[in-house]
Swiss-Prot record:
Top EC class of this enzyme: transferase
Gene Ontology molecular function: N-acyltransferase activity
Family from the record: Belongs to the transferase hexapeptide repeat family. LpxD subfamily.
HAMAP family referenced in this protein's UniProt entry, alphabetically: LpxD (MF_00523)
GO cellular component: membrane
Gene that specifies this protein: lpxD
Highest taxon above the source species: Bacteria
Protein name: UDP-3-O-acylglucosamine N-acyltransferase
Assembly notes: Homotrimer.
EC number: 2.3.1.191
Length: 341
């Protein structure tokens, strides 16, 4: 297990050390940390735990530093906690090299520095670049390209002509390039061949059991530094912009474009052939059925602006009561009409 002096961590992360130097052997929560572990405070609602915490040091902002005897002062405590965690985390896996139990087509090009576990399948004319790791059960179809420093976890599938950039993480069970949902609306529901492809740009992370489909023609694209949670469905021909976050169980229908720096919260549903602008936040379980311009915050189904959504959410539990009152008023008005009042 790695060990660091607190002063070493401060230097590596360019943080300010407050208090004396100690040896640190791990990372833990404020509640569970021991005197030789480091913790963090990123949310003020946990500030009461500072007094009770046994952590040897705490990563926190300058305004709270006086409350603890030993601290690493940070402008972004949660980010720097992640960086410290990386120092102590042990990489998954126990295999180096290229297994003779993997199938690699003779026309495939696999870097000597790649790690290919047993029972990986690599199809014809596929390229695997330097320092990329493929865990057991990964299937890579023909004419695929995987860039440098990627990690692809077990039982992931890349269908033919799928491309992944550099520094990507693809979690277990992901399927990239499966057929989009394309059928002619005839009595036979004839299948339309899906011969497009999927391109994943640099520094993308895709969570477990997410699917990104290819279309009839053209490309489904996930752009740089976008982060996708588990169990997300991205339809054929979709484009997702840079630095966008997509949370679990979101569904995006075919040929929709999502802009840069967007947040799609859990279980949001986006109809097909739409354009969602840049810097858009879509709340959980929202239903989007029209184009959305830049810089919007939306909620509800059908989705409306955030303020309207919050107001209607407050009113909704009162609807039965209000309905009764309206019916009562209607009866009073009817009686007045009958008596010409």
């Amino acid at each position: 297990m790695p060990q660091y002096k607190l002063s070493e961590i401060a230097k590596l992360l360019n943080l300010t050390l407050q208090g004396d130097d100690i040896e640190v052997v791990g990372v833990n929560t404020l509640q569970d940390a021991s005197p030789n572990e480091i913790s963090f405070l990123a949310n003020a609602k946990y500030i009461h735990q500072l007094v009770l915490s046994q952590a040897g040091a705490i990563i926190l902002s300058k305004e709270y530093a006086s409350r603890v005897p030993r601290a690493l002062i940070s402008t972004e405590p949660y980010r720097d906690f992640g960086r410290v965690l990386s120092l102590f985390s042990i990489p998954q896996g126990c295999f180096d090299g290229i297994s003779h139990q993997a199938y690699i087509h003779p026309t495939a090009q696999v870097s000597k520095t790649a790690t290919i576990y047993p029972f990986v399948f690599i199809g014809s004319h596929t390229v695997i670049e330097e320092n990329t790791t493929l865990f057991p059960g990964v299937y890579i179809g023909e004419h695929c390209h995987i860039g440098k420093n990627c990690t692809i976890y077990p039982n992931t599938v890349l269908m033919a002509n799928t491309s992944i950039g550099n520094d990507c993480i693809i979690h277990a069970g992901v399927v990239l390039g499966s057929d989009g949902f394309g059928f002619a609306l005839t009595e036979e529901k004839q299948k339309i061949p899906q011969v497009g492809n999927v391109i994943i740009k640099d520094k993308v992370e895709i969570g477990a059991n997410t699917t990104v489909d290819r279309g009839t023609l053209g490309t489904t694209t996930i752009n740089e530094n976008t982060k996708i949670d588990n169990l997300v469905q991205i339809g054929h021909g979709v484009t997702v912009g840079k630095n966008t976050v997509i949370v679990s169980q979101v569904g995006i229908s075919g040929s929709t474009s999502i802009g840069d720096n967007c947040i799609l919260a859990g279980q949001a549903g986006i109809s097909g052939h739409l354009t969602i602008g840049n810097n858009v936040t879509i709340g959980p379980q929202s239903g989007i059925g029209k184009n959305i311009p830049d810089n919007q915050i939306l909620g509800g189904s059908p989705a409306v602006d955030r303020q309207t959504f919050l107001k209607t959410s407050v009113l909704m539990p009162r609807f039965p009561e209000l309905f009764k009152r309206i019916k009562k008023l209607e009866k009073i008005l009817e009686k007045k009409k009958e008596h010409n009042i």
